[in-house]
Amino acid sequence: MKIAFIGEAVSGFGGMETVIRDVITTFRQQHIQSEMFFFCRNDKMDKGWLEGIKYSCSFSNIRLGFLRRAKHIHALSKWLQEYQPDIVICIDVISCLFAAKARKKSGIDMPVFSWPHFSLDHKKHAEYITCADYHLAISSGIKQQMINRGVAESTINVIFNPVETKDSVIPAPEEGETATFIYVGRMKFEGQKRVKDLLDGLSQAKGNWKLHVLGDGSDFEKCQAYGRELNIDDRIVWYGWQQYPWELVQQDIEKVSALLLTSSFEGFPMTLLEALSWGIPCISADCVSGPADIIQPDVNGHLYQPGDIAGFVTLLNKYIAGEIHIEHEKIPASIDEFYQSKYYDRLHKVIISAISRRK
């Protein structure tokens, strides 16, 4: 079987790239051939994450949108004729349009899947999702967004995203030790990640706490400055971007009370799954989409309404005071359906079903 993954150029540093790379690597082990095709304006895409993956690119910096699209569609149709895939999986919504048009132009009949990794409510051209035949939703929230745009529910499969099982658990601080929180992600002061809410909440929390921040982004210095403004900077350790953040958490931080996520929206926050796979509970905004699929209150963490700083502070205070007792050793079992073996079983069945229906 041959699979084509297509999409616009990506940054190369996010959770989406990690998932795509892992899926292609696993498919290769199952003797499923995969190649990628990117639509690019220039050659600036970081390609480090594509090591070992065969890929092609269509370049166009034509300013007129319809001409730029026509060039990409022509390039894709030629590539499809050469590669002859059994299935096309689009990693973003605009690619669904390109794939549908290129399929027609190439004369090759193969099923087209959408596999968007971001909330459709916060993406341009989300209506093009309907150009795909079938849909892989990474969260229940994204499934609903697809339905809201006219996609038939029968064509949608919620597959989530996979996480590796771990061979150890990161413990909580002992009673009497300082509560230790971590944030692992991009530095966006407001916008999607709302690190401002995280800092505001901690500044109002009672008792002793420490925050370790692993991540970089356009607002890194702004977030640091705000920490100083709130007079909490002496309790925050800023690490910047880390290639292996969880190794740093395990080896240097050692004990963690909870991971914090204060986003206004997500696609499917892998940072929650990673934390839980290490036995770390999570305090997360119940934003669209993903956290509600992952977090089970009192079992592996807690949810609060996005923007409800008072609700966030209440949870922080309970964790700091030791009023919440979640056994870290039991947390990894709470995300059993997200581990790789079950994920690939789901994905394989969906793909085989689509191909057999097409024949």
UniProtKB/Swiss-Prot annotation:
Organism in which the protein naturally occurs: Escherichia coli (strain K12)
Function of the molecule: Galactosyltransferase involved in the biosynthesis of the core oligosaccharide region of lipopolysaccharide (LPS). Catalyzes the addition of galactose from UDP-galactose to the first glucose residue of the LPS outer core. Cannot use other sugar donors, such as UDP-glucose, UDP-glucuronic acid, UDP-galacuronic acid, GDP-mannose, ADP-glucose and GDP-glucose. In the absence of a lipid acceptor, can hydrolyze UDP-galactose to UDP and galactose.
UniProt similarity note: Belongs to the glycosyltransferase group 1 family. Glycosyltransferase 4 subfamily.
Residues binding UDP: Q242, E274
EC number(s) from the headed UniProt entry: 2.4.1.-
Protein name: Lipopolysaccharide 1,6-galactosyltransferase
Keyword hit for Glycosyltransferase: yes
GO biological process, alphabetically ordered: lipopolysaccharide core region biosynthetic process
Keywords of the record: Glycosyltransferase, Lipopolysaccharide biosynthesis, Transferase
Example of a GO MF term: lipopolysaccharide-1,6-galactosyltransferase activity
UniProt xrefs under Pfam families: Glyco_transf_4 (PF13439), Glycos_transf_1 (PF00534)
Encoding gene, per UniProt annotation: waaB
InterPro entries for this protein: Glyco_trans_1, Glyco_trans_4-like_N
Catalytic reaction annotation: alpha-D-Glc-(1->3)-[L-alpha-D-Hep-(1->7)]-4-O-PO3(2-)-L-alpha-D-Hep-(1->3)-4-O-PO3(2-)-L-alpha-D-Hep-(1->5)-[alpha-Kdo-(2->4)]-alpha-Kdo-(2->6)-lipid A + UDP-alpha-D-galactose = alpha-D-Gal-(1->6)-alpha-D-Glc-(1->3)-[L-alpha-D-Hep-(1->7)]-4-O-PO3(2-)-L-alpha-D-Hep-(1->3)-4-O-PO3(2-)-L-alpha-D-Hep-(1->5)-[alpha-Kdo-(2->4)]-alpha-Kdo-(2->6)-lipid A + UDP + H(+)
Pathway given in the UniProt record: Bacterial outer membrane biogenesis; LPS core biosynthesis
GO cellular component, one term: cytosol
